[in-house]
């Protein structure tokens, strides 16, 4: 009786609760479930969806999709997979959801069965009939093909995905990562398709520029084939398609009767992190000494100052030495090159005196300032004067690019001017029209509302910048950055990250650190880009800042691979390479598709002389990003350490074909050619590297060493005298100068230069040579005791 009375007392309360529930005659159970998912009440949504699926027999496919969707969003992928695989499916979204969850669970056979009707690689007709689902299905197919190393087919699937939905950013990243190009033509097709116009131009060629690991590289016997891979790469990009502006003008004349409509992008998968490489000094046995310079005209000033005028740098006594350094290797057009403004006060770690050198600012910021201030004057014509030191003061971090020479890699180098680099990387066809057209890259008026149209214009512009960065075409990237509005650069994280990546790729580590550090401070919750920030600090040997960054990331974002890459960089800078390897492996465990972690792991394994594991790590990076030139370069260095020079030459040539603007790789190629006895070819490669930056001290030192190996003593002496005037605190220069004088019979000058080298490097930290050099160098009086 007591229980009955209690139940009677409760019933009115429940009735009152249900009576307070808002009644809406048009509201369905699907609306209630979606409302719960919007409020992140996934367990409640799953309960209602399961109840709805078990009781609704009229529209079982829709209720099944809703139930499976709730499970997937709640990260209950095993339950979602079990549900979908236990029933007969119908409909594009159900098949795609089963394929997606199977791929996430690494059930590739089930993924293929859901995606393809037959085992022929053709996506189901039901999926293809729904363009929004087809775009995601094609992208998933591309990822599967990439895992199976079918790069050309993966590129084609990415193109199909973009044809269906151009707003899939992950599809654009994947498309460029597989070697795609000419995004402007893809946007043009989207514009015409959006307006119901037939695209009568043929589809763009989908030929991949990715070199196959089974295809041998270009012959190294000829200097032309080795020294000019950039022409081959740039010729692939050339096309004769019309510009975006011309296509828009055509479509504006034919859209007067078209009903305005707005396409809505589908749910985009999480953005794939672009590969962010560590530069070549990561695996070199000697790193350059970083200068503590304050670049007043750097890119970072864009984020703190409204605009800055271009100033002419003051010249010091060092400029005369640098002018002498340039006299014999600069191109005839070098006097007309565009240069950058800014003054840097450079402090050498090994010298107590301070020297003021004019330092250039990036063309991107110079052009951006010119765009913001249309009345700005033309940039003054002058030379870059910032040099790079040869070696690091830390002997344990000093790693040479070659195991058999005492050469030096340049890592703290500056980017060539616009005219110098135009011969190497001409503007891409996809952005050629935007370089000469001040009008925004807009789409047809009347089809999209103004806000959508504005966002689409910015999206298209950012996509073209991504294409320029992915193809290492800095001239096009500079022009596109200059055309962006200042507010977009200041307030868009993706644009800042792209700007930081561009600085990082060109070894402008100080500017990269300033840009990405400012981004991290403004948006502390964002982790993307911190792997580049930590690597920039590694190059600058900023131990305290790197330690603080890694501490913050590993505390607040332990489940992100970028955090453990930063921790690995921190341990590597402190020469704790075993702990660094553990951190990189942890990053790979968190994200098995993070190619940058594989690259860093390979570099650390090279330092530990675990060459087979390092090669496997680089190959894993190439599976994920076949155009990652750092992975090709690292693989070449592994073979170089194994003294497999021909295989190393082939791999490094592939890296140069992908990125022809990397001077360190050209120096390494020249060292391999020198070991093979091809001195002339090696000199051609060094001269090509010097055309990118005539003031690169490391490249010039390598050129002097090659002249010494070729017994061209007079030319070597002239080159070293110029280097001595430009870099009077580098022990390597005086050491090689002493060897030249000894060979020429100038014993007193040889002893004098040996003495200066010992004063600059009393503990021999810079004296990193192998046994071959020692046996060949010292003390053979019959070779060095008489003039040659």
Curated annotation (Swiss-Prot):
Residues 241-273, 293-303, 319-360, 391-414 have a biased composition (Polar residues). It is found in: Nucleus. Keywords: Cell cycle, Cell division, Developmental protein, Meiosis, Mitosis, Nucleus, Repeat, TPR repeat, Ubl conjugation pathway. Changing residue 529 to R: In ax520; mat phenotype. Expressed in the ventral nerve cord. Signal peptide: none annotated. Changing residue 580 to T: In ax72; mat phenotype. Changing residue 140 to F: In ax227; mat phenotype. Disruption phenotype: RNAi-mediated knockdown results in defective metaphase to anaphase transition (Mat phenotype) and embryos that arrest at the one-cell stage. SMART domains: TPR. Residues 198-436 are annotated as: Disordered. It holds the Pfam family ANAPC3. Pathway: Protein modification; protein ubiquitination. Its main location: nucleus. Changing residue 467 to K: In ye121; mat phenotype. Changing residue 531 to G: In ax212; mat phenotype. InterPro entries: TPR-like_helical_dom_sf, TPR_rpt. GO terms for cellular component: anaphase-promoting complex; cytoplasm. TPR repeats lie at residues 561-594, 596-628, 629-662, 664-696, 731-764. Residues 217-229, 366-378 have a biased composition (Low complexity). GO terms for biological process: anaphase-promoting complex-dependent catabolic process; asymmetric cell division; cell division; cortical granule exocytosis; meiotic cell cycle; metaphase/anaphase transition of mitotic cell cycle; polarity specification of anterior/posterior axis; protein ubiquitination. PANTHER family: CELL DIVISION CYCLE 16,23,27 (PTHR12558), CELL DIVISION CYCLE PROTEIN 27 HOMOLOG (PTHR12558:SF13). Belongs to the APC3/CDC27 family. Probable component of the anaphase promoting complex/cyclosome (APC/C), a cell cycle-regulated E3 ubiquitin ligase that controls progression through mitosis and the G1 phase of the cell cycle. The APC/C complex acts by mediating ubiquitination and subsequent degradation of target proteins. Developmental role in early embryogenesis and the metaphase to anaphase transition in oocyte and spermatocyte meiosis and mitosis in germ cells. Required for embryonic anterior-posterior axis formation. The APC/C complex is probably composed of at least 12 subunits: apc-2, apc-10, apc-11, cdc-26, emb-1, emb-27, emb-30, mat-1, mat-2, mat-3, such-1 and gfi-3. This is Cell division cycle protein 27 homolog. The lineage of its organism: Eukaryota, Metazoa, Ecdysozoa, Nematoda, Chromadorea. The gene is mat-1.
């Amino acid at each position: 009786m007591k229980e009955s009375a209690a139940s009677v007392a409760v019933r009115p309360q429940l009735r009152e609760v249900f009576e307070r529930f808002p009644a809406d005659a048009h509201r369905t159970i699907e609306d209630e479930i979606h409302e719960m998912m919007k409020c992140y009440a996934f367990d409640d949504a799953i309960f209602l969806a399961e109840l709805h699926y078990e009781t609704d027999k009229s529209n079982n496919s829709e209720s099944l999709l809703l139930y499976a969707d709730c499970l997937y969003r709640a990260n209950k992928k095993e339950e979602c997979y079990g549900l979908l695989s236990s029933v007969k499916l119908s409909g594009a979204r159900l098949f795609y959801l089963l394929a997606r969850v199977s791929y996430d669970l690494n059930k590739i056979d089930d993924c293929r069965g859901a995606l393809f009707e037959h085992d022929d690689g053709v996506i189901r007709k039901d999926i293809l009939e729904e363009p929004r689902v087809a775009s995601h299905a094609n992208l998933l197919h591309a990822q599967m093909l990439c895992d199976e190393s079918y790069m050309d087919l993966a590129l084609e699937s990415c193109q199909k995905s973009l044809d269906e939905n151009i707003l899939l950013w992950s599809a654009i990243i994947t498309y460029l990562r597989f070697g795609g190009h000419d995004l402007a033509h893809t946007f043009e097709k989207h514009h015409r398709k959006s307006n119901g116009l037939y695209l009568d131009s043929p589809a763009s060629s989908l030929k991949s520029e990715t070199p196959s690991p089974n295809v041998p590289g270009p012959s190294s016997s000829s200097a032309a084939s080795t020294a000019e891979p950039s022409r081959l790469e740039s010729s692939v990009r050339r096309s004769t398609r019309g510009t975006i502006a011309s296509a828009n003008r055509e479509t504006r004349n034919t859209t007067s009767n078209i009903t305005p409509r707005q396409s809505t992008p589908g749910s985009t998968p999480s953005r794939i992190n672009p590969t962010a490489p560590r530069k070549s000094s990561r695996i070199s046995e000697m790193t350059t000494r970083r200068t503590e310079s304050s670049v007043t005209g750097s890119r970072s000033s864009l984020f703190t100052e409204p605009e800055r005028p271009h100033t002419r740098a003051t010249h010091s006594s060092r400029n005369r030495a640098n002018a002498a350094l340039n006299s014999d290797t600069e191109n005839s057009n070098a006097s007309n090159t565009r240069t950058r403004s800014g003054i840097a006060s450079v402090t050498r770690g090994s010298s107590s005196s301070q020297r003021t050198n004019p330092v250039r600012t990036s063309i991107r910021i110079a052009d951006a300032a010119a765009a913001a201030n249309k009345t700005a004057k033309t940039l003054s014509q002058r030379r870059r004067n910032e040099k790079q030191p040869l070696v690091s003061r830390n002997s344990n971090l000093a790693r040479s690019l070659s195991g058999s020479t005492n050469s030096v890699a340049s890592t703290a180098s500056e980017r060539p001017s616009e005219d110098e680099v135009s011969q190497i990387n001409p503007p891409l066809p996809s952005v050629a029209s935007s370089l000469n057209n001040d009008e925004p890259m807009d789409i047809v008026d009347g089809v999209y509302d103004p806000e959508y149209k504005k966002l689409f214009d910015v999206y298209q512009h950012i996509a073209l910048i991504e294409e320029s960065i992915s193809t290492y075409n800095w001239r096009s990237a500079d022009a596109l950055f200059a055309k962006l509005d200042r507010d977009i650069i200041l307030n868009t994280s993706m644009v800042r990250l792209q700007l930081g990546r561009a600085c990082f790729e060109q070894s402008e580590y100080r500017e990269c650190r300033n840009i990405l550090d400012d981004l991290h401070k403004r948006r502390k919750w964002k982790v993307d880009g911190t792997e580049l920030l930590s690597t920039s600090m590694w190059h600058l040997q900023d131990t305290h800042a790197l330690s603080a960054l890694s501490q913050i990331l590993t505390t607040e974002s332990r489940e992100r691979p970028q955090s453990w890459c930063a921790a690995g960089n921190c341990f590597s800078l402190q020469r704790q390479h075993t702990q660094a390897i553990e951190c990189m492996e942890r990053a790979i465990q968190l994200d098995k598709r993070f190619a940058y972690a594989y690259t860093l792991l390979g570099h650390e394994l090279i330092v530990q002389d675990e060459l087979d594991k390092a090669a496997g790590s680089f190959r894993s990076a190439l599976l994920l990003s076949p155009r990652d030139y750092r992975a090709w370069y690292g693989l070449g260095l592994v073979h170089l350490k194994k003294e497999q020079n021909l295989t190393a030459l082939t791999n490094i040539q592939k890296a140069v074909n992908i990125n022809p603007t990397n001077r360190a790789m050209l120096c390494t190629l020249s060292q391999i050619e020198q070991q093979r006895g091809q001195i002339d070819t090696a000199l051609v490669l060094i001269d090509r590297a010097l055309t990118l930056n005539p003031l690169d001290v490391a490249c010039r030192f390598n050129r002097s060493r090659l002249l010494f190996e070729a017994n061209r003593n007079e030319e070597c002496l002239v080159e070293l005298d110029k280097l001595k005037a430009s870099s009077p605190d580098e022990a390597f220069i005086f050491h090689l100068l002493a060897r030249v004088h000894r060979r020429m019979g100038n014993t007193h000058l040889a002893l004098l230069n040996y003495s200066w080298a010992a004063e600059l490097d009393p503990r021999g930290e810079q004296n990193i040579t192998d046994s071959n050099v020692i046996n060949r160098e010292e003390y053979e009086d019959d070779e060095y005791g008489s003039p040659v």
